[in-house]
Regions:
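Conserved N-terminal helical subregion
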Residues: 1-3, 20, 45-173, 177, ...
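Beta1/beta-strand and adjacent pyrophosphate-binding region of the FAD-binding site
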Residues: 1-11
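Conserved Rossmann-like nucleotide-cofactor binding loop
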Residues: 11, 34, 149
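Glycine-rich FAD pyrophosphate-binding loop
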Residues: 20-40
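Active-site substrate-recognition segment that forms the wall
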Residues: 184-217, 231-233
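Flavin-binding catalytic cores
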Residues: 219-240
């Protein structure tokens, strides 16, 4: 049996590894000419860790990521609102950079399974993935893992407009090795926004800030000063 997986992101690569384990021969179609670092961090909770363990990736995640034993939610004054103790519940949780997880998945897949610079424009229910410049690729299974603007979804189910979630965000990974963050993930809730951070492995910290804005609102030219009371004072968040 052969399967066609469209998209070489986290979901597509996970599906490819699972299909390999099930004895199916998958081929992965990726429109990018090369796989570059994309996105920033992930928090892998217990269910995700169990899923990755079933793919043979748990030890890699533990090595390349960072253990997270608790999560904290705080107000702008730094006062604790909620504490989730993952370790006490036996919930194995890790923070990891997307690029680290993606690379680990790529290493678990035979190189000849991956076809880069291949754009899929849709699929048929008979198992054909339609390409923009070559003949279709056929398999008994087609897995659409081509992201938020999925061509597979659109070709099978029609147009589905994106729904605005009410927030915009800034995200990044930063080298931070002095140990003050430890094994915790922290999110600060402010008026109309917030800020979160946590360990991502190998001396890196994943952080993000978000604010609630109407759909279509223009983004500020400079994020500095747009903390929306996420911290007190805001200058602490946006200092050079």
């Amino acid at each position: 049996m052969q399967a066609v997986v469209v998209g070489a992101g986290i979901g597509g690569l996970a599906a490819t590894i699972a299909l390999e384990h099930a004895g199916v021969e998958p081929i992965v179609l990726e429109r990018a000419p090369e796989l570059r670092e994309a996105g920033f961090g992930l928090v892998l909770s217990a269910n995700a860790v169990m899923a990755l363990d079933s793919l043979g990736l748990r030890d890699v995640v533990a090595t390349r990521g960072a253990r997270v034993t608790q999560a904290e939610i705080r107000n702008p004054r730094g006062e604790l609102l909620t504490l989730i103790d993952y370790e006490a519940h036996g919930w194995e949780t890790y923070g990891i950079l997307r690029s680290s997880l993606q690379q680990a998945m790529l290493e678990a897949i035979p190189f000849d399974r991956l076809r880069l610079n291949t754009t899929c424009i849709g699929a048929n229910e008979d198992g054909r993935a339609l390409l923009d410049d070559t003949d279709p690729v056929t398999g008994e299974i087609v897995v659409g893992a081509d992201g938020i603007n999925s061509a597979i979804r659109r070709s099978l189910f029609g147009e589905e407009p994106l729904r605005y979630g009410g927030h915009r965000a800034w995200r990044a990974g930063t080298r931070f090795e002095d140990g003050r963050i430890g094994e915790r993930f922290v999110e600060v809730w402010g008026v109309g926004g917030g800020f979160g951070f946590g360990p991502a492995g190998r001396g890196r910290v994943y952080w993000y800030c978000f604010e609630s804005v109407p759909e279509g609102a223009p983004a500020p030219e400079q994020p500095r000063g747009s903390s929306s009371a996420a911290t007190a004072p805001g200058s602490t968040l946006f200092r050079p």
